[in-house]
Amino acid sequence: MGSSSGQSGYDLSFKILLIGDSGVGKSSLLVSFISSSVEDLAPTIGVDFKIKQLTVGGKRLKLTIWDTAGQERFRTLTSSYYRGAQGIILVYDVTRRETFTNLVDVWGKEIELYSTNQECVRMLVGNKVDRESERGVSREEGIALAKELNCMFLECSARTRQNVEQCFEELALKIMEVPSLLEEGSSAVKRNILKQKPEHQTNTQSGCCS
């Protein structure tokens, strides 16, 4: 399972959003997944995204993962980024109970308002399980809320990388089980190839593309 580069070296392309309160570890989760490193990061200002290519279920995937700011003043900025997302990861901090209750009070409502895809796959992720002694939300509570919201569920630690890859891989597998989302992922690749064709024609008069 490795990253690969190449403009059309993948079979499917999916857009995934990371949402949740500021400080729950969304950026750390993303950095841990992308680069296998763990860093203490400053809060994201606005929206950032990163791309990861990997193979899941025998398919080469390009995941464009959007990391949205959790601060209240940036919330309106994120509304357009829900458009076209095939997967949404709702992140909370298992040591901060308010980040868990906000999944319903704030983020669940935001998804209802802004998500344009009814079949979009959602996953509830409890981060910072490496701080078990400080836990304020039990695993059982997380599972119960995930059932209530019709979400997948996983606990992880961006710091130790426990379950980080599993989080994104399980979400991608679930997305591929939904025919309409699978079609969207395939169409995105075709659009990308068509977009690039004129570039190849002008830049290389006689050559072959890999």
Swiss-Prot record:
Location of the motif Effector region: 41-49
Cellular component per GO, a single term: peroxisome
Amino-acid positions noted as binding GTP in the UniProt annotation, renumbered to this chain: 20-27, 67-71, 127-130, 157-158
Highest taxon in the source lineage: Eukaryota
The entry's keywords: Cell membrane, Cytoplasm, GTP-binding, Lipoprotein, Membrane, Nucleotide-binding, Prenylation, Protein transport, Transport
UniProt cross-references to CDD domains, sorted A to Z: Rab18
Localization per record: Cell membrane; Cytoplasm
Residues in coiled coil: none
One annotated GO biological process: protein transport
Predominant subcellular localization, coarse grouping: membrane
Keyword tRNA processing: no
Membrane topology: Lipid-anchor
Entry keyword annotation includes rRNA processing: no
Function: Intracellular vesicle trafficking and protein transport.
Description of how the protein assembles with itself and partners: Interacts with XI-2/MYA2.
Full protein name: Ras-related protein RABC2a
